[in-house]
Amino acid sequence: MLFRSIFKQMKEHNTPHVWLDATKIKDFAERFPTIYSSCLDNGINPNTQLIPVSPASHYASGGVKVDLNGLTTVKNLYACGETACTGAHGANRLASNSLLEGLVFGTRIAEIIAKNIGEQEDPIEEDQKIFLADPAIKMPLQLAMSQGAGVMRSAKSLTETLAILEKLGQHQSTSPRIESWEVSNLYQLAMAIVKAALLRQESRGSHWRSDFPETLDIWQKHIVQKLDSDGNWSSREEVVQK
């Protein structure tokens, strides 16, 4: 895929980006107005200058395990969109399909909730340990994931990334604010991704292992992970039903 070639060039030449030549696209501003505006804001004129580009994560193919009605394993808790793992996208989402998924499953969930909504009850008292990460770990977490668990993965890079994440997880926050919750969510998602990527010893869709470049039939499975209230992770495999 294109992003692998870009990443390979960046690694070989030790550069943070490659150059995109869009100067031959006469109607660039009309076809890509958002990108054009962003380039101008950063002092780049796409009509006359090369654009620096690099791969970036913008979608998670996994998510909270749900059924075809968006119901999670927690009673009366539903999830849809990028939050959920419906299986609709397979191993790699096609552009714009996330909008269709959100519309379909969002409608299903809304209809079910509307039919079964009960009386409002008092909130449940929190009686479990709460993990809150220090917002300061956000940047090193993102760097570790991009370098070791991003476009190109291997047992070595993933193991090193997991070690970094475990160290970062020791930096916790005692202040329950938005930044703490956001980084906590990023941290737990990163852990789930790295652990699953280590288990999946093959390449499939957007998951590419340089040490296991082939796609294997025995890996037509979902990897389901669970984090218990004591912070312990467990994984199991579910064969995809045809």
Name the predicted role of every residue range.
Residues 34-78:
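FAD/FMN-dependent oxidoreductases across multiple families
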